[in-house]
Amino acid sequence: MKMSSRIGLFKLLILLFFQIYSVYAFTDGSDFTALQALKNEWDTLSKSWKSSDPCGTEWVGITCNNDNRVVSISLTNRNLKGKLPTEISTLSELQTLDLTGNPELSGPLPANIGNLRKLTFLSLMGCAFNGPIPDSIGNLEQLTRLSLNLNKFSGTIPASMGRLSKLYWFDIADNQLEGKLPVSDGASLPGLDMLLQTGHFHFGNNKLSGEIPEKLFSSEMTLLHVLFDGNQFTGSIPESLGLVQNLTVLRLDRNRLSGDIPSSLNNLTNLQELHLSDNKFTGSLPNLTSLTSLYTLDVSNNPLALSPVPSWIPFLNSLSTLRLEDIQLDGPVPTSLFSPLQLQTVSLKHNLINTTLDLGTNYSKQLDFVDLRDNFITGYKSPANNPVNVMLADNQVCQDPANQLSGYCNAVQPNSTFSTLTKCGNHCGKGKEPNQGCHCVYPLTGVFTLRSPSFSGFSNNSNFLKFGESLMTFFKNGKYPVDSVAMRNISENPTDYHLLINLLIFPSGRDRFNQTEMDSINSAFTIQDYKPPPRFGPYIFVADQYKTFSDLEDSKTVSMKVIIGVVVGVVVLLLLLALAGIYALRQKKRAQRATDQMNPFAKWDAGKNEMDAPQLMGTKAFTFEELSKCTNNFSDANDVGGGGYGQVYKGTLPNGQVIAIKRAQQGSMQGAFEFKTEIELLSRVHHKNVVKLLGFCFDQKEQMLVYEYIPNGSLRDGLSGKNGVKLDWTRRLKIALGSGKGLAYLHELADPPIIHRDVKSNNILLDEHLTAKVADFGLSKLVGDPEKAHVTTQVKGTMGYLDPEYYMTNQLTEKSDVYGFGVVMLELLTGKSPIDRGSYVVKEVKKKMDKSRNLYDLQELLDTTIIQNSGNLKGFEKYVDVALQCVEPEGVNRPTMSEVVQELESILRLVGLNPNADSATYEEASGDPYGRDSFEYTGVFPTPKP
């Protein structure tokens, strides 16, 4: 009786379960079909979208309402790959679609996306969607936030977007959009002037052109930010812009605007940021004393009329940053200019300012940087206990031998080494970082980009500390699972003055975030819930792919029976493996000695990663003892430098050969598989103009790469005079050609092809014959690798050499190497680093160049060594043309490296030299002893050649 009652109770519970399930389950049929289409297209969702009922079992990233209709899809930073299926248009109740940070989502947007008429939030930021923005997007009349930035959209802005009357956030920056800004015709055609509720026009870094329509702005608009920077707008600034009373940030810099700067801007009394640099404005700078809230004023690089330093600037009481570079200012600088209480940065370089510079006694206590290089200043009256970094190079005062060693004649603009990462003694594994308590965890990382900060320079770190405190206050108040935050590698894009902060967000309570937690953090940035401190301006945050989710969600669905079964099965399997292992070990010992003789990788110590010995091309495996002996136990005397990867040591083998050993530090150690892949790749690279890998060491928990030793150091050492090498014009041409051949080989003849990703003068070495050799593949990527289109938000490469497109796409390609090489070519001309004392060599050459004059009128920029030792600079103009083609802002307009090599070879012929006298063409110089067939990986050690 008791048994039957238990069975009856069990049946009752089953029945009750299905009754409850029937109430709270069964997703709407059409919605399920649409989600299934997404799942089929984005196969990475197959693990988290398992059940047959998305609403009933809460598929990750899916939210449903009480009617089992899908109302939200939030799949940020999920490594999604593929396209956006047209079936998504059937989700008629969808209100939120957030696919932020999936850089392998591509293809055009579905033309029927306008069917999602209840959509209020659409964010596709940081993907790779292309093609035109569909006209149907104008049907999304409930939309309040639209983020299409950091994609590859082309074509024009649809006029239909003027119907989005509820839109507040409108961000289409960092795309390839072109054409004019659409405005309404007063009848049936809508336009952007109808967006009266919009607070943000973020249109920067596109190809938009034509005049900015007078009709675009009106007093009824509620705009806070107008970011039109980095486009191709022409004509004058519309007077109507002065009617937008709420405006706080205005960026019109890096366009082709002309005419007078309108005095109507003085009506924008709430304006905090005004950027008008790099245009073609003429006339005088109008009096802007009504802009009492202004933090930043930048009118640099405009052909304004000759005039004195404006006397009204001291009345801008909130001013923090003042940039009036190259606008024909003359006369003295009044001491009152430095008196605004919040003033931190003043840059008036490349003007006609004269007499003695005097900061006075009432200068701002916040002042830390004054740049008046390239003027006609005859003296400097330095205040007592002066904390200000003053730069006066290229002025008359610095021509006096008595002043040439003074700080103000040699000062350099400070770079940031600021980091708030906790310094802990222990080393964390790959992907982990120490949190505030020195526990190794997996942080959420990404780049926090300030699009218009009202502070500049890195000498005052208080701004960044306030930022960190502000973030933690936000996370704590919102009860986010965040233990701490940290910053590192803060940098400023020299093109648009965007400030890039590499941000680390550490999980609380365990070593990683789960998917829900990561989504909530990303969402806080995407919908701008987080408000940074004053003066930080508009921002975006693009997170790196997070692939180490906590499995806590999945563990809840695993039954105890399954767990027990798995444990029992594993135990039995381990016993069988142990018995088999004992037998195999006995057999292995018998052949160990012979194997060691035949295969130097028999002692490959891969730890827990079992793998075949790497396939190598004439490369030797060294033991730790061998390399320790040849470097005197890695003594400081043998330490010749280092970087992010680790230290480099000079060593001498028993046969007398000198070698360079790259010894990885703990923080940059790779897994065994990754290290194997790298040495297999490097061993197959054989070219006269590429540094040769001689061997490697994977022993005693060490990872080392052994290269041929290059005695004359780097090209940067040569240009700076550090290695005592005199580089005349012909030597520089040969160095350019040699390094170009090396890169062309990597791009086009190496198999698989390689993108270097960090081309710079420090990574071009000079041997005893001054033959250039491309070095340092620590950041290289295989072009044929799955990561060919790898997009990362962690800043790669080196500032000054970075492809401008990288700041928009976070993607490095072969054309990124071409850009870096173009910067090196200009560096060969000037002898200076690409960013020297705050000046960017690319911008300086373009600004000073006059093709109608001898040597393009660039004599002032040339390294004096060229002029003193070279005589007639044949081929100079053609060389400059090639270099400037390489540094075109858009990769599609740059040549390939093989095309660059052909041009450089023709220049050497013009000079009267044989381009192949000292080195073969890049095809012939490969010196590959194995032939192209050996480049195909077979997974076995190659048979030695007789």
From Swiss-Prot:
SUPFAM superfamilies associated with the record: L domain-like, Protein kinase-like (PK-like)
UniProt family annotation: Belongs to the protein kinase superfamily. Ser/Thr protein kinase family.
Molecular function as annotated in GO: ATP binding; protein serine kinase activity; protein serine/threonine kinase activity
Record-linked PROSITE patterns: LRR (PS51450), PROTEIN_KINASE_ATP (PS00107), PROTEIN_KINASE_DOM (PS50011), PROTEIN_KINASE_ST (PS00108)
Gene Ontology cellular component list: membrane; plastid
LRR repeats: 67-91, 92-116, 118-140, 141-164, 166-191, 195-219, 221-244, 245-268, 269-293, 295-314, 316-340, 342-365, 367-387, 389-407
Residue intervals of the Protein kinase domain: 634-908
Transmembrane segments: 562-582
Positions on the Extracellular side per record topology: 26-561
UniProt source species: Arabidopsis thaliana (Mouse-ear cress)
Secretion signal span: 1-25
UniProt membrane topology term: Single-pass type I membrane protein
Domain of life of the organism encoding this protein: Eukaryota
Keywords, ordered alphabetically: ATP-binding, Glycoprotein, Kinase, Leucine-rich repeat, Membrane, Nucleotide-binding, Receptor, Repeat, Serine/threonine-protein kinase, Signal, Transferase, Transmembrane, Transmembrane helix
Catalytic activities: L-seryl-[protein] + ATP = O-phospho-L-seryl-[protein] + ADP + H(+); L-threonyl-[protein] + ATP = O-phospho-L-threonyl-[protein] + ADP + H(+)
The protein's name in its UniProt record: Probable leucine-rich repeat receptor-like protein kinase At5g49770
Carbohydrate-modified residues: 246, 267, 287, 354, 362, 415, 460, 489, 514
Residues the record marks as active site: 758 (proton acceptor)
Residue numbers spanned by region Disordered: 919-946
Alphabetized Pfam families for the sequence: LRR_1, LRR_14, LRR_4, LRRNT_2, PK_Tyr_Ser-Thr
